[in-house]
Curated annotation (Swiss-Prot):
A lipid is attached at residue 21 (S-diacylglycerol cysteine). GO terms for molecular function: phosphate ion binding. This is Phosphate-binding protein PstS. It comes from the Bacteria. Gene3D superfamilies: Periplasmic binding protein-like II. Belongs to the PstS family. It comes from Staphylococcus saprophyticus subsp. saprophyticus (strain ATCC 15305 / DSM 20229 / NCIMB 8711 / NCTC 7292 / S-41). Residues 80-89 have a biased composition (Polar residues). The lineage of its organism: Bacteria, Bacillati, Bacillota, Bacilli, Bacillales. Part of the ABC transporter complex PstSACB involved in phosphate import.
Length: 319
């Protein structure tokens, strides 16, 4: 029987711990065992949860846990060596790479899904249908105090801007893509659900977060189209997010500790499952799968990292 246990890790989430059920065995017979620990992005968290649910069915001797302390918080734990993998909604930063290098930790990057940072306003807002990146920058830099400051045709009502806090990869992505690395002046919160609720309650509210959060709350919020640098206006949909035509599309990642991956058959089995799933769990969680060839290419990359011995074990196990 599958067991679920929740352990609070931060204000924004909890660690999901799954004791798997199904086939038996140990490392010698080709089956993994033991613990696999992760942490990181609250955006990626629901995908890992869906993957764990499926993986648990055939891997009773492997326990996978994953916290949601944010991309930055996840990397801190990854750098300290307390986790085997780190979930991220942005690429690893140079300073994080350096810290890993200083500790002699080799890591590998895997893309597992595609997301689109979605801009939303209050459901009763009847004038904001689209925004340029420059207008978003004016709002989130504090330069535009009222909607009229953004567009002379809009009402002179004070804007209430909401944002994830600095622990989120979504914050870093927005800072990079929209703010040109400038400061965000908005009411920040570690809990994305609080941002959703704030925009819902405030008629002059505006907020941003991952596409799946919008999908879960689209009956409560109004989505805003984004005009890219070429002047093309696009709304976030599964198609525009996957093909990258939506201006705020981004990949979602799992970073793995290479030594721990090589030493832990259960970890290897989990990562193989992640890639063999080919984005089905991401779609189940409201995200967008990568093109199938991307998963196939990364499966080859994983095989190269793990080595031929692991592949032989799998061949034995399947006979």
């Amino acid at each position: 029987m599958k067991k679920w246990q929740l352990f609070g890790t931060t204000a924004i989430g909890a660690s999901l711990l799954l004791g798997a059920c199904g086939g038996g065995g140990n490392a010698d017979s080709g089956k993994g065992e033991g613990e696999v620990k992760g942490d990181g992005s609250s955006t990626v968290g629901p995908i890992i949860e869906k993957l764990n649910e499926k993986f648990a069915k055939d891997n009773k001797d492997v326990t996978v846990s994953s916290g949601t302390s944010g991309t930055g918080g996840g990397f801190e734990k990854f750098i300290s060596g307390s986790t085997d993998f780190s979930n991220a909604s942005r690429p690893i930063k140079d300073e994080e790479k350096k810290k890993l290098d200083d500790k002699g930790i080799k890591y590998d990057e895997f893309k597992i899904a595609q997301d689109g940072v979605t801009i939303t306003v209050n459901k009763d807002n009847d004038f904001v249908d689209e925004l340029t990146k420059e207008q978003l920058k004016e709002i989130y830099s504090g330069k535009a105090k009222t909607w009229k400051d953004v567009n002379p045709k809009w009402p002179s009502k004070e804007i209430k801007a909401y944002s994830p806090d600095q622990s989120h990869g979504t914050y870093d992505f927005f800072t990079e893509e929209v703010m040109d690395k400038g400061d965000i002046k908005a009411e920040k919160n570690a809990d994305t659900n609080v941002i959703v609720q704030s925009v819902q309650k405030n008629e002059q509210g505006i907020g941003y977060f991952g596409y799946n959060f919008y999908e879960q709350n689209k009956d409560k919020l109004k989505e805003v189209k984004v005009k890219d640098d070429s002047g093309k206006t696009t709304e976030p949909t599964k198609k525009t997010i996957q093909d990258g035509s939506y201006a705020l599309s981004r990949p979602l990642y799992i970073y793995t500790n290479e030594k721990k991956l090589k030493d832990n058959k259960g970890f290897q089995d989990f990562m193989k499952f992640v890639l063999e799933d080919k984005g089905k769990s991401a779609e189940d969680a409201g995200f967008v799968a990568l093109p199938k060839k991307d998963y196939t290419e990364q499966q080859s990359k994983l095989d190269d990292i793990i080595g031929k011995d692991s592949k032989k074990d799998d061949d034995k196990d399947s006979k």
